[in-house]
Amino acid sequence: MAKDDVIQMQGEVIENLPNATFRVKLENGHVVLGHISGKMRMHYIRIFPGDKVTVELTPYDLSRARIVFRAK
């Protein structure tokens, strides 16, 4: 599966939801539903409300995102 068509954006986690899902507010003001990527889940990287994250959006569904990086 090619990941060439993803859109990377910065955002801030505003709410924790069940099953490692988060509500993320992007820099442009949109709020999306984000889930943790597999590598972050595998390495037990914790995410809390207020954390700055990098998300990947697919052009097919702009309301969902994959969290790929948590800023320190």
UniProtKB/Swiss-Prot annotation:
<keyword id="KW-0694">RNA-binding</keyword>
<dbReference type="GO" id="GO:0003743">
    <property type="term" value="F:translation initiation factor activity"/>
</dbReference>
<comment type="subunit">
    <text>Component of the 30S ribosomal translation pre-initiation complex which assembles on the 30S ribosome in the order IF-2 and IF-3, IF-1 and N-formylmethionyl-tRNA(fMet); mRNA recruitment can occur at any time during PIC assembly.</text>
</comment>
<comment type="function">
    <text>One of the essential components for the initiation of protein synthesis. Stabilizes the binding of IF-2 and IF-3 on the 30S subunit to which N-formylmethionyl-tRNA(fMet) subsequently binds. Helps modulate mRNA selection, yielding the 30S pre-initiation complex (PIC). Upon addition of the 50S ribosomal subunit IF-1, IF-2 and IF-3 are released leaving the mature 70S translation initiation complex.</text>
</comment>
<dbReference type="GO" id="GO:0005829">
    <property type="term" value="C:cytosol"/>
</dbReference>
<dbReference type="GO" id="GO:0043022">
    <property type="term" value="F:ribosome binding"/>
</dbReference>
<dbReference type="Pfam" id="PF01176">
    <property type="entry name" value="eIF-1a"/>
</dbReference>
<dbReference type="GO" id="GO:0019843">
    <property type="term" value="F:rRNA binding"/>
</dbReference>
<keyword id="KW-0396">Initiation factor</keyword>
<dbReference type="InterPro" id="IPR012340">
    <property type="entry name" value="NA-bd_OB-fold"/>
</dbReference>
<keyword id="KW-0648">Protein biosynthesis</keyword>
<dbReference type="InterPro" id="IPR003029">
    <property type="entry name" value="S1_domain"/>
</dbReference>
<keyword id="KW-0963">Cytoplasm</keyword>
<comment type="similarity">
    <text>Belongs to the IF-1 family.</text>
</comment>
<dbReference type="InterPro" id="IPR006196">
    <property type="entry name" value="RNA-binding_domain_S1_IF1"/>
</dbReference>
<keyword id="KW-0699">rRNA-binding</keyword>
<dbReference type="InterPro" id="IPR004368">
    <property type="entry name" value="TIF_IF1"/>
</dbReference>
<protein>
    <recommendedName>
        <fullName>Translation initiation factor IF-1 2</fullName>
    </recommendedName>
</protein>
<feature type="domain" description="S1-like">
    <location>
        <begin position="1"/>
        <end position="72"/>
    </location>
</feature>
